[in-house]
């Protein structure tokens, strides 16, 4: 393989920066109306609309990725700098069970210093819930100087990324063939990014994180612990903690790998000192992952005539009922970056949601499990990100269908067959949504009615008519008992949540315990099923009907985003692929709201809490989930109001910012909803009256004000 680049393809110039809209003939003329600024933002990064040249589009996307990485490094640098300059990290490291993490101190300008609460150890600041302190501890960072160094390093990397973005667009831009060489890309991404990346992290964990955390767990003062480079350069230091280090690489080359089991463990469960996963387990995990991906990165055919070829694999992939199978999909995925992105977003979004569920059930960092605010924040964060990525997958799949799909080259393959029986798919999915909606809400309505009539014996509950989630309980039991069969050396199952084990408490707070599932979980689970299926229905319908429908057969000519099919065609609004993304987003919000509510209440009721010297656990909401969450009234009274009222009453305390955010978020919600409900004509009439008044006073603007278009109003409304 030869890496083909074009030298000096585009001159470096800042002239275009002074010409807003330079990428479009229409926009480059400048603004006539206020719509111009909307179109400027909508199209600035829509590289497809700037040119039809796939090579140029690919180069722009590639270059933009380096810009994105630079922003990430700058953001990370800021986080580490705050840790170094404004935080109580060293104090927290010394006493993580009594001192809360803080990395921001508010300046006293007009009384905002009220926000600086006492986080323990005499430090006043805003408590942070990002989990950075815990990940720094797991990395082996023991001083604020190390945070300064890392922050500086991140800025240097940001500069390198910015340089790379410029270099690979202006100086040495890859040819299209390079972007389309999937075998080489797979080898490099699998072996390089994932394989060597995991190996590097495993190496850092073994040589730096493990010894430092071992000493911290034993109560050694962070200032007494040797510096990271001393562990790397002085093997004797490591050998004192992990005796197998004294033997060097001999066990590795003699295949006596079990010698290394003092620092590459397979224990399961949590470290009772920190309430986090055993870091020796995670080091072992990353080493294993590295080996797998290094092997995977050598599976695809490039310079030598061995290995897999993606096109051959796809075209051989045929079943007895699938026509041409995957024939034609290789061409789609190497010429449509929207199609490629749609698949990647769907997988990454699903993975992010899996991460959300593992962060609490298998807390990876020390003391993360007893920092309940951080646990809640990390769960919420990963659910939201996952939701956005999955909706983005549908958006780009629909853009692919409108802009890149060529029906003449896709005959009777799987994509064509899916499109041809889209009516069956959508109508079946619609039936599933109706079934789930009526039945899941019906169970709640039944319970509310029986509760109102004073007939608790007729309710669906753990103490009356039981609807136990028997399959979920079976999975829990299987996982709880499996280590004795599948991993005889493991001392516990993968997660305490499966059951079987005792609770782990750190600093008189519950880190984790077996999570019981009952009728209440069965009910809310079916609400999850309902909201997820409706989200999928809307998004999938948008993709399958992006090019045409019975209502608008020529939809593809109208594009990805249009308000209605012109005047005289009533009932054709909110029908574009873009509108399906818009409506799908609302249902994604619905879906994750119920998930976050369920998680928040369940954990406070059945897991989180304090433990007395006698071993008695007192949960935050006293175990009220099983009986209260089985009615809609219970959700409103014992969760939404019970929790919100505490936030609303936070004014005048260091928590008042949360009360103000809570209030502000509802204002934003109401304000954005206004854009969905109000008609465009109403605003245009109002604007014209105001412009008339300005004309009277001879202060009329040169750029004519224009009411938001229907699509623009929806964009504001959904945000």
Curated annotation (Swiss-Prot):
Per UniProt, what is one GO molecular function of this protein? 4 iron, 4 sulfur cluster binding
What topology does it adopt in the membrane? Multi-pass membrane protein
Primary localization class, coarse: plastid
State where chlorophyll a' binds.
666
Q: Which domain of life is it from?
A: Eukaryota
- Chain positions recorded as [4Fe-4S] cluster binding sites: 564, 573
Give me any GO biological process, just one: photosynthesis
Please give an example of a GO cellular component term from this record: chloroplast thylakoid membrane
The places in or outside the cell where this protein is found are: Plastid, Chloroplast thylakoid membrane
Which residues are listed for phylloquinone binding in this entry?
683
Residues that span the membrane, as ranges: 61-84, 147-170, 186-210, 282-300, 337-360, 376-402, 424-446, 522-540, 580-601, 655-677, 715-719
Q: Where is the signal peptide?
A: none
- The UniProt record gives the binding positions of chlorophyll a as 674, 682
Keyword entries, A-Z: 4Fe-4S, Chlorophyll, Chloroplast, Chromophore, Electron transport, Iron, Iron-sulfur, Magnesium, Membrane, Metal-binding, Oxidoreductase, Photosynthesis, Photosystem I, Plastid, Thylakoid, Transmembrane, Transmembrane helix, Transport
Check the record and name the Pfam families matching this protein.
PsaA_PsaB
The UniProt note on the cofactor reads as follows: P700 is a chlorophyll a/chlorophyll a' dimer, A0 is one or more chlorophyll a, A1 is one or both phylloquinones and FX is a shared 4Fe-4S iron-sulfur center.
Q: Which reaction does it catalyse?
A: reduced [plastocyanin] + hnu + oxidized [2Fe-2S]-[ferredoxin] = oxidized [plastocyanin] + reduced [2Fe-2S]-[ferredoxin]
Q: Self-association or partners: how does it assemble?
A: The PsaA/B heterodimer binds the P700 chlorophyll special pair and subsequent electron acceptors. PSI consists of a core antenna complex that captures photons, and an electron transfer chain that converts photonic excitation into a charge separation. The eukaryotic PSI reaction center is composed of at least 11 subunits.
| Purpose of the protein | PsaA and PsaB bind P700, the primary electron donor of photosystem I (PSI), as well as the electron acceptors A0, A1 and FX. PSI is a plastocyanin-ferredoxin oxidoreductase, converting photonic excitation into a charge separation, which transfers an electron from the donor P700 chlorophyll pair to the spectroscopically characterized acceptors A0, A1, FX, FA and FB in turn. Oxidized P700 is reduced on the lumenal side of the thylakoid membrane by plastocyanin.
Return the similarity comment: Belongs to the PsaA/PsaB family.
**NCBIfam families linked:** psaA
Name of the protein this chain belongs to = Photosystem I P700 chlorophyll a apoprotein A1
Q: Which gene encodes it?
A: psaA
